[in-house]
Amino acid sequence: MLEEIKAQLRAHCEVMTALQGELSPAIESAVSLVVDAYRAGNKLLVMGNGGSAADAQHFVAEMVGRFKLERRALPAIALHTDTSILTAIGNDYGFDRIFSRQVEAHAAAGDVVVGISTSGNSPNVQLALELAREKGCRTVALLGKDGGSIKSVAELPLIVPSNDTPRIQEGHITIIHIICDLVERELFLKGN
């Protein structure tokens, strides 16, 4: 058992090393998109399924509440948190439309819409990102494996280089924390 624990920790470290090298420029671009949107008076909309929904909700909580700094709330919406909306849309339009219908209702040009999918193949996330781009939103996708079908839809795909879902999720939450930290610094510590 001890060897398995060490193996999993090594795998985690390998993913973090890959983020530091391969994905750092893309993470910087994601931070810039979010900062620019907030400076322009826009908002952040985030979505995912299962564990990715938990990560999306965490991201939104850090923006609306705070990450590290005492500051004003930043507008952000997690698109999976209202069970009445989800079940109404799912029942009337199908599960694939649960996010796109909300993007239709809430997203405006200049907003940043973030989709999270460890496989990169979640149809409901893909449809929402496609609609968001049509509406003039900036789109970011946190993905894993080979990026799946979503990598070609998102303006900025951030693909965690792993095929192991837990490692991908660890990469996603690390990226989210970096974005939250740097967005706060850019907006509230640099006097902008």
Swiss-Prot record:
Cofactor(s), names only, from the UniProt record: Zn(2+)
InterPro entries listed in its UniProt record: GmhA/DiaA (IPR035461), Phosphoheptose_Isoase (IPR004515), SIS_dom (IPR001347), SIS_dom_sf (IPR046348), SIS_GmhA/DiaA_subfam (IPR050099)
GO biological processes: carbohydrate metabolic process; D-glycero-D-manno-heptose 7-phosphate biosynthetic process
Domain SIS: 34-192
A cellular component annotation (GO) from this entry: cytoplasm
Pathway, per record: Carbohydrate biosynthesis; D-glycero-D-manno-heptose 7-phosphate biosynthesis; D-glycero-alpha-D-manno-heptose 7-phosphate and D-glycero-beta-D-manno-heptose 7-phosphate from sedoheptulose 7-phosphate: step 1/1
Keywords: Carbohydrate metabolism, Cytoplasm, Isomerase, Metal-binding, Zinc
Descriptive protein name: Phosphoheptose isomerase
Organism: Geobacter sp. (strain M21)
